[in-house]
Regions:
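Conserved catalytic motifs of ABC-family nucleotide-binding domains
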Residues: 160
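Helix N-cap at the start of a conserved alpha-helix in ABC-type nucleotide-binding domains
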Residues: 175-177
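Conserved ABC ATPase "signature" region
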Residues: 116-134
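Conserved ABC ATPase signature
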Residues: 139-143, 147
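Catalytic Walker B motif of ABC-type/P-loop ATPase nucleotide-binding domains
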Residues: 164-167
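Helix-to-loop junction immediately C-terminal to a conserved catalytic motif
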Residues: 48
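ABC ATPase NBD Q-loop/coupling interface
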Residues: 57-79
């Protein structure tokens, strides 16, 4: 669970987040809804420590207990990120890495696994998002946009996160593929009891995915 309490954030004197409060629950797809420019992305970035808030609290129920993001050091924020998966508007894959190597990247950065365990975990995550094995060794440019998004989801869950942040996850996808991605995010959220936060202005996606 994440508790946002009375959060304030301004840029150059312009208030973007004005005493925002909300609870984001485990095992559910929690929606941040609003038109473009309403502050959705600012709130999400504030919740993962990419923006420093001007006031209020953002409290995570981490594996080590409750932690207030507002009082964390830079090192503590990095430690928190080990429990956070992130899915960006674009798939944001590394063009120079294969599909499997992209999923292994967070494991290389943050885990103490052996090389064999990293490969096994990456392949498990790719299978979980229904990627065909023949695609594991392909480059991102060799697969479709929908498949790229699947790879991005596999990478986001590689570290077995407690929290999954999705910024416009259906951006650039056709309606049919969007439904598939929505269902995949829902299934993973419930299966692993993840606290998932989705930022969207797409009403069709909101009705399909949100709890």
């Amino acid at each position: 669970m994440i508790q946002v309490k009375d959060v304030v954030k301004s840029f150059d004197g312009n208030v973007v987040l004005n005493h925002v409060s909300a609870n984001f629950e485990d095992g559910k797809v929690n929606m941040i809804i609003g038109q473009s420019g309403s502050g959705k992305t600012v709130l999400m970035k504030s919740m993962i420590g990419l923006h420093q808030i001007d006031g209020g609290e953002i409290v995570f129920d981490t594996r080590a207990g409750q932690q207030n993001l507002a009082g964390m050091t830079e090192k503590e924020v990095r430690m928190l990120h080990r429990e956070v998966g992130m899915l960006f508007q674009g798939a944001a894959l590394f063009d120079s890495m294969t599909v499997q190597e992209n999923v292994m990247y967070p494991l290389e950065m943050f885990s103490d696994m052996t090389d064999e365990e990293k490969v096994e975990r990456a392949r498990f995550c790719l299978e979980r998002v229904n990627m065909p094995e023949r695609a594991f060794g392909l480059m991102p440019s060799e697969i479709s946009g929908g498949m790229q998004k699947r790879v991005a989801i596999a990478r986001a869950i590689a570290l077995n996160p407690k929290y999954l942040f999705c910024d416009e996850p259906n951006s650039g996808l056709d309606p049919r593929t969007s439904l598939v991605i929505d269902q995949l995010i829902q299934d993973i959220t419930r299966e692993y009891n993840i606290c998932t936060i989705v930022n969207s202005h797409d009403m069709n996606s909101i009705m399909e995915i949100g709890d």
